[in-house]
């Protein structure tokens, strides 16, 4: 799912917060390496590369240079769902009440994902790459009770307790939420 998320960002279809963090990190690298003279210039170059498709093309070239066949790399960037592994089940988790998305408890999500193979309890445990989450709402967005906010990709059947726990991971507010940049400060 991480590869899919990366491809979506490069296609210009990624979540706002993931795209923001990618652009911020890339801009910092470009400024520090002398490719850009300012963060503003770097951000403009990065968003231009995403919009024009150059960033996605560079990703495809990187895959080919690492041994992926050209036809597979092309399919990966054009239609990633046909190449990437997929889980046996996708469970939609819905909001229990209406309101503005104020918080998603990532620790709750991580613990359940780990139980289903997306993480390790011991160093010997195997990670199952097709297990994970798609969060389909963003902080500050209004959601109605019963609307899907999370898709869990998994191979084992979820228990009722796990579904209830996932449902409880979303907190909403009756008041609008002010969403700030994910960047608090740059430590040099």
Task: Show which residues each predicted segment covers.
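Well-ordered secondary-structure scaffolds
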Residues: 1-188
């Amino acid at each position: 799912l991480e590869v899919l998320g990366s491809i979506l960002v490069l296609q210009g279809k990624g979540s706002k917060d993931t795209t923001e963090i990618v652009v911020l990190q890339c801009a910092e690298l470009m400024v520090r390496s002398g490719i850009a003279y300012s963060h503003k210039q770097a951000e403009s170059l990065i968003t231009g590369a995403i919009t024009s498709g150059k960033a996605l093309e560079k990703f495809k070239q990187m895959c080919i240079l690492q041994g992926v066949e050209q036809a597979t790399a092309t399919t990966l960037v054009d239609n990633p769902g046909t190449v990437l592994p997929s889980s046996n089940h996708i469970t939609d988790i819905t909001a229990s009440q209406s309101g503005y998305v104020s918080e998603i408890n990532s620790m709750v999500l991580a613990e359940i994902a780990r139980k289903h193979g997306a993480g390790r309890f011991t160093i010997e445990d195997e990670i199952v790459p097709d297990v994970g989450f798609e969060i389909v709402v963003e902080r500050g967005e209004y959601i109605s009770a019963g609307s899907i906010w999370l898709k869990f990709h998994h191979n084992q059947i979820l228990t009722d307790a796990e579904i209830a726990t996932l449902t409880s991971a979303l907190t909403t507010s009756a008041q609008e939420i002010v969403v700030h940049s994910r960047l608090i400060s740059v430590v040099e």
